[in-house]
Structures are given as structure tokens and as C-alpha cells.
From Swiss-Prot:
InterPro entries for this protein: 6-blade_b-propeller_TolB-like, AB_hydrolase_fold, PD40, Peptidase_S9_cat
One GO cellular component term: extracellular region
Region ranges (Disordered): 269-291
Active site location: 558, 641, 673
SUPFAM superfamilies (UniProt xref): alpha/beta-Hydrolases, Tricorn protease domain 2
UniProt name for this protein: Dipeptidyl-peptidase 5
Gene Ontology process terms (BP): proteolysis
Glycosylation sites: 96, 252, 605, 638, 699
Signal peptide: 1-19
Gene: DPPV
Signal is among the record's keywords: yes
EC number(s) per entry: 3.4.14.-
Length: 726
């Protein structure tokens, strides 16, 4: 057990330590959502921790006491990929990634308080996850998902025959999606049953593919779909799943449906909200999500957008009666927030939903029959909600969340009452020592069209009488936000503790401040958002005396990377000592190489060939803009980023080099739009922070700050001089 002490949070901090470093950030324990047992006594959650010395990330599962917040170890077996409660909560079902079937997984059942007392119920012949269970007579029906072959079988990569050629042949889109070339396999929801034999359950290995009979359907939908894309009714008889509209071009439209199908697959799944269908509200043809059955299984709630090619449209709650032809009802449809998840109370009368509101992921409640103009009520909690589960049959929920100052917040929330803290990681993990809400504050500034929100993040040991260089961080999306939440990639506190004050703006295009602000970036990427950023920068310069804008830096990823490239060619670009652009577009016309065409065709008001002027308007490579470039810039782009090609980053670096501007190109051949592998993440931080520290002067003022020379990777430089030295 000694080797797994990290599984249980430390009771006290070490007596001394450095500020929050990239090593602390990457190696801090990472905890998953806490799922309570049916009695409301314990919750189980996954935890892992990266070890830089051993270059591995062992993991395990813990139990959280819901009365006092105490944590105990359930298992240290890293092969246990997921756990769910069985029956009254005295037992658990878990999936083990090692199995006698090569490439398959085992389904095991164990006592919740004696994990070693486990038995194997059966094997699944392929990768399988996302278990959901429901009692059905003397059986336990379940659903989960895996990859399907074209014939409908569960795909087993280990058993697959090696192709005679590496060729890929396409007659339609997608060719690539996010980080993967699309193949013949696709995601599908499968159903099965655990049969009781005496006091044990067994699984015969038989699964029914519920998705494959619907041609061109796929669920969960990649790249981010998971178990939230489907649900199993409480009686175990009916399954709901979300799929993009099978009859429509998936790369061009976001339309998706909620399908209903018997658990045994005896009928082909049918959509309840088909576009222009008899039950579907008029004009509603956008993306659907989060299907969930009412406790009695007679109704199903889900979320849906209206617009068919807009991934950031406002979601509205919908409720449909199961087995009925009655029209689908829209709930609180005038609420100017976009719900992200929905659940029913145990009596089926109240809906609990999460939604982003003013840069915080909040929990709300509303009646299940709420009228259009109803405004949901906020449930008090700290930080942002990642997930929530009801505690027994009560109105209280167990919230798993995080914030800008802690990567795990477990708390109990009850409508109309103060929240009750169970476990906050920053109060226990040595790596997070000193982090807290005291160093975070909001900033509101008059922007181009309305007031714009930003977060100010201060370093450990902040002194208002001192001056700190500005780190101006621009979020991606563009329909996204800097929220009061923890990022495992771009974490403002890591930047601040190099010796900066971070300002993280939420300009035009950001989510959580009303749909108009989100929509207003359409065909205006370099317009209002840029003006917002200028006004925020000017406000900081003129009114916040502890921030040094003369030695500030700007950095961003994705849309934030585009904005940094845009800023390089604008007056604001001359105000920074250094720039960092991660996976940002450079040449306007290159956007046609992206994967999800609906994204660019919405944001630029037309197709690449019919509205070319809109794509060209915000082209960072225009000669008149490039002529203004002079600020040192770090460019980052990865080979498996299929949102926008690595050629974008290479082209940007080429121009910087030919212009003789101090610049560096950082590339990870095994990373995507994001950098997620621990050792790569450390190098990323060493390069990014080392770059800005060099040009901002932090290396001189803070001897402990990261330097470019701290990175062990050899720099490739085959040229002794710049092109313009000759």
C-alpha cells in the first residue's frame, strides 16, 4: 500500500515549497467524477498521478464518505477502467482492461467494501466502456459502447486482419475528424444482460448492436461523445441514444436526433425529433444532446439547438413522452443560457441542469413543466460543475467540480441551502499548496459593443505594491470562454506563478454571457473581438497599477492563436514584448482544409467558394499586415491537428524567419490540436514559459522562473544567418 499513498490526499502541506510549477501542475493527482451509491453513503471516483521519475501514470479508485468527506482506497489496480454501483450499493460492477480474450475486457463484480472479494461475470470480445445498468426482473440489463464493424459486430483491434495495403479511399466526408482519419469502424451502443445464478451474476458474452441497423447512424458521436450520449430506462427495457442525422451530410450540418430502441433490439431505433417530423417543434433542426429518461421511464428530456449548421447555438430543454405521438415540449425556451446537461429529480417533477453563466458552470433547477419565460433558480456551490448525481432519493446532489484555484471540488448542494464541502484538492494536495480564490478576481470593461468580462489571476505571494508583467491570454473556440474552471492544458495559474499577472478576457464570441455575445462574432473574427481586447488592454494599462503592460506578452491557442497572429499585424502587436501562437490559422483560404465544414461555413457566412471574401477579410497573411510584424513570436503546431493543418504553423514560421523576426517553431508529431502527453506537456511549458520569460524580463527579475535552456530537447538550427543578413 505504501506505493499508493498518493491515492489518499495528504493531511497537511509540506512546511515549505516553491510556487506552482509546471511539474506540480502535471503531476498533481487527477480525480474523476464522484458517483454516489444508491443509499447515499459512499461515492466512488477514479484518481491518477503522473510520476516523472518512472515515466508512468498509475491509477486507482477511491471511496468518498458522503457524511464527513473522508477518502479511502478501493483499489490500486490501474487496469480497472470504470466502476458502477450494482443493486443497493453493497456491490459494484467494474470493467477490467486485461482479459483472457485478447483485445477484450472483463466484466467483474465485487463487494464495495472488500474489492478483493471479486468474481468475473464474463468477457466482452472487444474494447467496451460506458456501462449503464438497470434491474429488469431477475436480470440486470446494461448498455455500453464500443467500435462497430460494418457488419454490426463489436470491433476487436487485436483480432482484426492486417490490410494488404495502407490505402484509404473516400467517396464522401469526413476524411479526417479532429485527430483521426475516418475508417470503416464507427461508434455504437451495445446492449446485454447479466443473468443471476444463485447469489452471483454471469454474462454470456452476447451483445446487441442498437445503432448499426440505422444506416449511417453513430453513437456516441466523436470526437467528444461518451456515455452522456445515451441512456437506459429505469426498467431496463428502453434505450435512448443520440446520433447525427443519418440522412444528412455530417461534415456540413450539425443536425442530430434522439433515437429510441428496445433494449433487446427487437425493433429498429426510431428518432423522436426528426427534422420536420410530426412531433418536432417547428424550426428546430440543430444538434441534440444529453438524453435522459424520467424516473418512471414515461418521458425523456434532452437538449437541442435550433440552427442546423451552428455548433454554438443556444440549447433548449425538450421533453418527449415515450410511446406517444404527442408533440415534443420546449421548457424555459426563453432562458438566455445554454444548458449542457439535464437530470430529473427522483419524483420527476423538477429538472436539474448545468449551464455556463458569467464564466462559471452553474447548477440550476426548474419545474419539469416550466413555461417558456421561466427563469431557472441557481443552486449554491463553489467553482464550476463538471458533473452531478442525486444522493439517494433526496433533493441534494453530489457535485464534482473544479475552479481556477483547484482541480477537484467535491461538495453537496441542496436547493435553498448553503453548499457543504466534502473535499477540495487545493486544501490537501502538496502540489496545489497556496492556491485559492484569494488570487482570482473578475474584471469588467466597456468593450466594442457591450461590457466584457475577464479574469485576473495573481501569482503566489502577490503584493499589490509591486509591479508584475502582463500575461494576456486569449481563449479558443472562438465560441468558448475562460471559465472559473481548471484546465489541464492552458492553466492561468501556472503562467501567473512565473511572476505575471494574468488577464484572461472573454471578448465577443464568448459563451455564458447571453447568446447575442456568442453570435456577434459571426463573420467578424478580427473585428469586435479584437476591439474588445484593445479596450481591455488599455484599461489595464491605465487603471491597474500593479500590472506592467510595457513588458507584457500575449498568447493564445486555436482561435486564440489566430487572434495572436492577427494582433501581430495590428497596432496592439507593438505593445507586447513577445507573442505565442498555438495551432492558429494564418492564411485565410487554408480554412477549407478543416474537418467540420459546418463550423467555417457558419462563422464566415457561406461556403469557401461562394463567400471567399469573408474568408479573406480576416487573413493574417495579407502583405499589408505582414509588413507591420516585428514582435518576437513562438509558433506551435502539431502533426495530428486535423482542425487546421500543421502547414499553417510552418507557413507562419517561414514568414517570421524570412522577415528576420526572432521566432521559434515547436512541433509535436504525436500530438493533436491539444498537447496532452505528460512529457510533451512539460516541454511545451518549458518552451512557452521560457520564451515569454526571456522577452518580458522575468528571467532577470525571477531567478526561479523557467528558462529556455531548462528544456533538454536539442534545438534544430541549420542556418548560421537570417535570409536578410545577405
Amino acid at each position: 500500500m505504501a506505493a499508493a499513498k498518493w491515492l489518499i490526499a495528504s493531511l497537511a502541506f509540506a512546511s515549505s515549497g516553491l510556487a506552482f510549477t509546471p511539474e506540480d501542475f502535471i503531476s498533481a493527482p487527477r480525480r474523476g467524477e464522484a458517483i454516489p451509491d444508491p443509499k447515499g453513503e459512499l461515492a466512488v471516483f477514479h484518481v491518477s498521478k503522473y510520476n516523472f521519475d518512472k515515466k508512468d501514470r498509475p491509477s486507482g479508485w477511491n471511496l468518498l464518505n458522503l457524511k464527513n468527506g473522508d477518502i479511502s482506497v478501493l483499489t490500486t489496480d490501474s487496469d480497472v477502467s470504470e466502476i458502477t454501483w450494482l443493486g443497493d450499493g453493497t456491490k459494484v460492477v467494474y470493467v477490467n482492461g486485461t482479459d483472457s480474450v485478447e483485445g477484450g475486457v472483463g466484466i467483474w463484480i465485487s463487494d464495495a467494501k472488500n474489492f478483493g472479494n471479486a468474481y468475473k461475470a464474463g468477457s466482452v470480445n472487444g474494447a467496451f466502456s460506458g456501462l449503464k445498468l438497470a434491474k429488469a426482473g431477475d436480470k440486470i440489463n446494461f448498455v455500453g459502447y464500443g467500435q462497430s464493424t460494418t457488419k454490426g459486430d463489436l470491433y476487436n483491434e487485436a483480432a482484426a486482419k492486417e490490410a494488404v495495403s495502407s490505402a484509404r479511399i473516400y467517396d464522401g466526408l469526413f476524411v479526417r475528424h479532429w485527430d483521426t482519419y475516418v475508417g470503416t469502424q464507427f461508434n455504437a451502443v451495445f446492449s446485454g444482460s447479466l443473468t443471476k445464478n444463485g447469489d452471483k451474476y454471469s454474462f454470456d458474452g452476447k451483445l446487441k448492436n442498437l445503432v448499426q441497423p440505422v444506416k449511417y447512424a453513430e453513437s456516441p458521436y466523436p470526437p467528444f461523445g461518451g456515455s452522456g450520449d445515451y441512456d437506459l430506462s429505469s426498467d431496463g427495457k428502453t434505450v435512448a441514444f443520440m446520433s447525427k442525422a443519418p440522412e444528412l451530410p455530417k461534415a456540413n450540418l450539425t443536425t442530430s436526433y434522439i433515437f429510441l430502441v428496445p433494449h433487446d433490439g427487437s425493433r429498429v431505433a426510431e428518432p423522436i425529433n426528426k427534422r420536420n417530423g410530426p412531433r418536432t417543434p417547428q424550426g428546430i433542426e440543430g444538434a441534440s444532446s444529453s438524453p435522459v429518461f424520467s424516473p418512471d421511464g414515461k418521458r425523456i428530456a434532452y437538449l437541442q439547438m435550433a440552427t442546423k449548421n451552428y455548433e454554438s447555438d443556444r440549447r433548449v430543454i425538450h421533453i418527449a413522452e415515450v410511446g406517444s405521438n404527442k408533440p415534443v415540449q420546449r421548457i424555459a425556451s426563453s432562458w438566455d443560457r445554454s444548458p449542457e446537461a439535464v437530470k430529473w429529480s427522483s419524483d420527476g417533477r423538477t429538472l436539474y441542469v448545468t449551464a455556463e453563466d458569467h464564466a462559471t458552470g452553474k447548477l440550476f433547477t426548474l419545474p419539469a413543466d416550466a413555461r417558456d419565460n421561466h427563469k431557472p433558480s441557481v443552486v449554491k456551490h463553489d467553482g464550476s460543475v463538471s458533473s452531478f448525481y442525486f444522493i439517494g432519493s433526496s433533493k441534494s446532489v453530489l457535485i464534482s467540480g473544479n475552479s481556477l484555484w483547484s482541480n477537484a471540488l467535491y461538495q453537496v448542494a441542496t436547493p435553498g441551502r448553503p453548499n457543504r464541502k466534502l473535499f477540495y484538492a487545493n486544501e490537501h494536495d502538496p502540489e496545489l499548496k497556496g492556491l485559492g480564490p484569494k488570487d482570482i478576481e473578475p474584471l469588467w470593461v466597456d468593450g466594442a459593443r457591450t461590457k466584457i468580462h475577464s479574469w485576473i489571476v495573481k501569482p503566489t505571494g502577490f503584493d499589490k505594491n509591486k509591479v508584475y508583467p502582463l500575461a494576456f491570454l486569449i481563449h479558443g473556440g472562438p465560441q468558448g470562454s475562460w471559465g472559473d474552471s481548471w484546465s489541464t492544458r492552458w492553466n492561468p495559474r501556472v503562467w501567473a506563478d512565473q511572476g505575471y499577472v494574468v488577464v484572461a478576457p472573454n471578448p465577443t464570441g464568448s459563451t455564458g454571457f447571453g447568446q447575442k455575445l456568442t453570435d456577434d462574432i459571426t463573420n467578424d473574427w478580427g473585428g469586435a473581438p479584437y476591439k474588445d481586447l484593445v479596450k481591455i488592454w488599455e484599461h489595464v494599462r491605465d487603471h491597474i497599477k500593479y500590472i506592467d503592460t510595457d513588458n507584457g506578452i500575449a498568447a493564445g491557442a486555436s482561435f486564440g492563436g489566430f487572434m495572436v497572429n492577427w494582433i501581430q499585424g495590428q497596432d496592439l502587436g507593438r505593445k507586447f514584448k513577445a507573442l505565442v501562437s498555438h495551432d492558429g490559422t494564418f492564411v485565410g483560404s487554408s480554412k477549407i482544409g478543416t474537418d467540420e465544414l459546418f463550423f467555417i461555413e457558419h462563422d464566415f457566412n457561406g461556403t469557401f467558394f461562394e463567400a471567399r471574401q469573408n474568408y479573406d477579410r480576416w487573413d493574417c497573411s495579407k502583405p499589408e499586415l505582414v509588413a507591420k510584424w516585428s514582435t518576437p513570436q513562438l509558433v506551435i503546431h502539431n502533426d495530428s491537428d486535423f482542425r487546421l493543418s500543421v502547414a499553417e504553423g510552418v507557413g507562419l514560421f517561414n514568414v517570421l524567419q524570412e522577415k528576420g523576426i526572432p521566432s521559434r517553431f515547436l512541433n509535436f508529431p504525436d500530438e493533436t490540436h491539444w498537447v496532452t502527453k505528460p512529457e510533451n506537456s512539460l516541454v511545451w511549458h518549458q518552451q512557452v514559459l521560457g520564451w515569454i520569460n526571456k522577452w518580458s524580463g522575468i528571467n532577470k527579475s525571477n531567478p526561479k522562473s523557467i528558462k529556455l535552456s531548462d528544456c533538454p530537447i536539442e534545438v534544430i538550427d541549420h542556418e548560421a544567418h537570417s535570409y536578410f543578413d545577405y
